[in-house]
Structure formats: C-alpha cells, structure tokens
Amino acid sequence: MISMAKALNAADQNIVSETGMAARPIVLIVATYIVTTLLQGALGSIPINKILGFALVVLLIFEWVSTRRSHLSSLGLLCFVLLSLHSTLVMISASQELNDLVYLASTMLMISLICSPRFRTSILEALLQYRTYISVVVIFSSMFLLLLLATGTGYVVAWGEAPYFKGLCNTEHTLASICTLLLVLIIFLVRTNGSKAVYCGCSLVIIYATLETGARTFLVPVLICLLLLIQNLFAYKWTKAALLLLVLFFGEAVFLKSGMANKFEFASGNIYADSLLSAITNGRNEIWLTDILAWANSGSMGIAFGNAFSTIYELNKRALSLYIWAHDDLVMLLYGFGLTGLCLYLACLCTLFHSLFASLNKGAAVLLTVFILFPLLLNGFFPYQHLVYAFVLLYSICSHELIPRKDI
C-alpha cells in the first residue's frame, strides 16, 4: 500500500499539461457553498446546493482528465467507475446512493489533485484573486451566526434534552463543518495581512457556534485551526504562548456552558450505553460491529466489491433502529465498495500523507494528518464536504508563504 502510494505520488508530481485551470471556479463555488448552506433553511425547495455540488464535481473531473497522469492513477479511476456501476446494480435507494457516490468521488478527486504542487499553487492564486469576496463571505457568515445565536434561532433538542445549535442547516454536524471551513478562510485572510481585530472577532463567533452544535468530532479540526490562527497572529513566541493560555482559560469557561459540554455529559451518562467504549463513542462501536459483521457475511462478491452504500442505512435501521451511515469512512468503504474500494481509498490517503510529509514541515504535516484522521475514523470525513474543502484549502495555504495585502 505504501509503495503504491509513493508510485502514485511520484507520477502525479510529473504532470505534463498545465494544472489548475479549474481552480478559480472551484474556489468561487466553495466560498458560495458556505452561504447557500448557511441559508439552506430559508431557500425552501430551491436545490442550489445540489447544483453547486454537481458543478464542482464536473470541474474536478475536468481538472483531473486535463492532466496527463500515470497508468496507475487511470487504473484507480477505472476501478472506481466499475465499483460505482456494481453499487448501482445492488442499491436500494437511488438518491441516497448517488449522494454518497458524488461525495466520495469529489473527495477522492480533490485528494488526488491537491497532491500536485501546481494545483496547490493554482488554488492559492485563486484565493488571492477572490480575496475580497472571501472576506465578505466570512464577515457575512459570522454576523449571520451571531444574529442566530443572539436571538436563539436555530436551536433544536437532540441527544437527550439539551438544546443544540444548527442554525438554518439540516444538521448540527453540517454547521460545524461550515465553521471549520470558515476558520480556514480566516487563517488565509490573516496570513494575507487582513485586520486581526476583525477576524479575531469573527473567529470567536464561529468557535462559539461550533461549541453550541455539540458536534464533538469537529473539536479537533477546530482546535488545529485555532493553533494555526494563533501561529499567524503574532510574530513573537511569548505572545503566541500568552494568547494560547488566555484562550484556553476563557475557552474552558465558555466550553463548560456550551452545547458541547452537554453532549459530553449526555454521552458519558447515557443509560443505554452497555460499555465504556460505547459511552465514549456514543454507540458508534455498535454501528461499526454491525456493519463489519454484515459485510463479512455478504458473500464473496459483497466482500470483494461491496454491497452499495444505500443498503448500509437500511441495515442500521433494522439492527439499531437508526437510519444512519457507518460513521467511519473505512467501515463505510468496506461495506459499500468491499475490499477493492477500501484498498483504493487507503491508497489515495497514503498518497496524500506522503505528499503532506514531503511538502510541509513535520509539525504542520502531523496537524493536517490529524485534521483528516480524527473525523475520518470517529464520524466520517467524505460525508462532510465542507470539511473536505477546508482541508484542501488549508493544505494549499500551509504550502506557501502568502503575499501581504492591505485590504480587510
């Protein structure tokens, strides 16, 4: 697996044709996607997010095929197409299957593209070109979240009896992934000499909104963003250390009164948890065990090529009375795409991790690796597209010294 990853990475470093032609519309769509998702509940039946998502996948495919890649990469694409065809033959819900296939394809294409230094440079150039628009998106989103929080709009009762914040999004986790993406954009704005006061204020609102969601999986990506933000706010180490201690002190006080603390309290005291592991994972270990056992008993075709992603929802509904996915990318791939798909996904991830440690300093590479692995293993990475976009942009930002700018 490691040798395959190195071969893929080496091949993708030697792209003959120019890359990054689609970087500008990709960045524009990602920034717009933040606003349309934040306003999702106010848009009614208008499928703007599906339109943007479809356009983004088309751009990613165009960008991928416009580069002359290795035969190994082309073989990987062929495997994905064949696995998708097999999945559609055994699916039980076309809409759910298409949704997961699009999310997975988008994620794997982005991971494949971002391993190219030229594409990372193109993404950075696009960020710089649309910097004013990105600034407007960040400030508008922060003010909108502040308005919702101040008026108590967008709170729902979930996971017990405590209220959790989801704004106008469909779930709390969706909002938390948006907040992570907004923090990444703030890092970019601060690194390009944006107003520290303005974006510190925005980041405080966004972090508080994340805490109110109760989505524990996003604590680690948000914490990583916070560390990188502090790293870029001040030049002297003592000021960075002092600010970090100050943030931790006040952060603890805010955390203890937030929805996140309620979620930890509910999970640790859940009377339905039959073990410590079940309490810590909030029952995810039972989902994983159910799905892995079902995969192991699915016959040779199911073991090798999967049983479709849509069937995992029905499986968990029958076994656990919950219509949910596996809450783990590897288990999801194992059941949906079988061993073949799991190996393909792992090869893609190994290629990415090799690229991270080859292009960044060790500390940054470790942080970005944890940024992916923590949600990937404990809840899911590819189902949360805003989190995927956040990683792609963060990797591009960390790969370059940015040009100072004077506007907000």
Task: Please place each PLM-identified region on the residue numbering.
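A juxtamembrane structural motif centered on a specific transmembrane helix
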Residues: M1-R24, V65-R68, N193-K196, S359-L360, ...
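N-terminal signal-anchor transmembrane segment
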Residues: M1-S66, V81-S93, F144-L147, I372
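Transmembrane alpha-helices of multi-pass inner-membrane enzymes
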Residues: V57-V58, V184, A365-P375, F381-I408
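Transmembrane alpha-helical segments and their membrane-water interfaces
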Residues: V58-T67, H86-M143, L229-L233, C348-L349, ...
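Hydrophobic transmembrane alpha-helices and their immediate junctions
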Residues: T67-R68, R131, K196, K240, ...
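Alpha-helical transmembrane segments of multi-pass inner-membrane proteins
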Residues: L128-Y155, N170-N232
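Flexible juxtamembrane loops connecting transmembrane helices in multi-pass membrane enzymes
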Residues: Y164, A253-L289, E314
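Long extracytoplasmic/lumenal interhelical loops at the membrane interface
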Residues: S278-F337
